[in-house]
Amino acid sequence: MAACYNAYSAGSQSFEFDEDDDDASFDSGYEKSFETEAQLSSRRRLDFGTPPTPAIPQPYSGGTWDAVPLSSPPAGFVGLLDTSSNHSTRSGRTLVEHLNSRATNGVFDPPLTSTPVKSPEDPNAPRPKRKYAVGKNRVTRSRSPTQVVKIKRFRRMKANDRERNRMHNLNDALEKLRVTLPSLPEETKLTKIEILRFAHNYIFALEQVLESGGSINLDLEKLQNFTLSGERITKELFDALFVNPQPYPLFGRMFPYGQGMAPLAQHQTAPASHAEQPPAMGGFQHGMDYPQQPPGFDFTGSMRFYHQQQQQPHQPHHLQPNPQQESSPQQFSQEKYDLFRGSFDAAANLHSTNLDSGIHQQSSFYSQTPPWKDYPEDQAHVHPVPHQHSYKNFAPQV
């Protein structure tokens, strides 16, 4: 009978075991932990009285463990089994210390092992790309509608912040560019697209000035006005604006570009080089003072003058234009001026009744159109009787 003491119980409890039972042991179980699967013999009762039998060491042939009989453990392993000491003599030592003290000095290095060994990787080998599920194959966690709304709101807030920062940066850059560009006058307000166009035209104009060696006088106000018109400057336009300014027609007269309707100075100095002189146009005369406001076209006055000329086919000889004066466009004809001046004054003094009575009597409308006939109003609505053979009479449908 073996007694087991329980220190946590109030009184001692006794358990009875069969002495013939091989599973029973008189030790504390500490020695049982040193037994391995190599001892396949039936359980035996520990006898601490007899000394242990020394094991015969068998050399390891370098093969597998199958060559060694299963009845005895491998060489050097028997020393780990301590059957001569009990628990009381080794209570202060740990299991690790006991194994280290009883193990042999030999190194266990079998040629074959079941532990996989990772082969060294080639640093130059391309690393395989990770494959992520994209599109329909992507599996996401199921979210509640509240979570979906919160996620969308958060994404929209982040997108709005990014757009706001982008617009702030763009406006700051455009403001710095506007301050750098010359503006005439200084309080001129330019839009964003006008700032960009003016920057392009200004840089292009400076490039052309550098290529010409600084001989071109760049008019910034003219360049700014050209930019505000919405045009993009090119090489040809730059030459027409600053290198060779061309005159433009205005009310039938030719004025040089950039001077508007101001009169030309008679003492204007000639340019240094003949190549830069603009070509002379047909109706423009150098050295003449043109009026500030060119004469407009009076349609009523021109019709009165035409009617007066029709009524006076034979003019005096001194009022007829001289063909020699017409052949020379560079000379001013005083007779032409007097002719038109007197004609307009005479037409203005005519009575309106006399003017309206015969203004178009000589036209083909009055000479080729038959006279009008007055028809009575009662006969205007009479329906004409159709010819008897022209239409077929049908019976009235009820």
From Swiss-Prot:
Protein location: Nucleus
Annotated spans, Disordered: 35-59, 102-144, 265-333, 361-398
Q: Which domain of life is it from?
A: Eukaryota
Bias (Basic residues): 127-141
What the entry lists under InterPro entries is as follows: bHLH_dom (IPR011598), bHLH_transcription_factors (IPR050359), HLH_DNA-bd_sf (IPR036638)
Question: Where does the record place Low complexity bias?
Answer: 307-333
Q: Which SMART domains match?
A: HLH (SM00353)
GO cellular component terms listed in the entry, alphabetical order: nucleus
Molecular-function annotations in GO: DNA-binding transcription factor activity, RNA polymerase II-specific; E-box binding; protein dimerization activity
Q: Which Pfam families match?
A: HLH
> Which GO biological-process labels does this protein carry?
axon development; axon guidance; molting cycle, chitin-based cuticle; mushroom body development; negative regulation of axon extension involved in axon guidance; positive regulation of transcription by RNA polymerase II; pupation; sensory organ development
Which residues does the UniProt record annotate as the domain bHLH?
Answer: 154-206
Residue ranges, compositional bias (Polar residues): 361-370
| Keywords carried by this UniProt record | Developmental protein, Differentiation, DNA-binding, Neurogenesis, Nucleus, Transcription, Transcription regulation
Please give the tissue specificity annotation from the record for this chain: Expressed in neuronal and glial precursors during differentiation. In the peripheral nervous system, expression is exclusively in one of the neurons that innervate each larval chemosensory organ. Expressed at a late stage in the development of one type of adult chemosensory organ, the gustatory bristles of the leg, wing and proboscis. Expressed very early in the development of a second type of chemosensory receptors, the olfactory organs of the antenna.
- PANTHER family, from UniProt? BASIC HELIX-LOOP-HELIX NEURAL TRANSCRIPTION FACTOR TAP (PTHR19290:SF163), BASIC HELIX-LOOP-HELIX PROTEIN NEUROGENIN-RELATED (PTHR19290)
Function, as annotated, reads: May play a role in the specification of the sugar-sensitive adult gustatory neuron and affect the response to sugar and salt. Regulated by POXN.
What protein name applies here?
Basic helix-loop-helix neural transcription factor TAP
Species, as recorded: Drosophila melanogaster (Fruit fly)
What taxonomic lineage is listed for the species of origin?
Eukaryota, Metazoa, Ecdysozoa, Arthropoda, Hexapoda
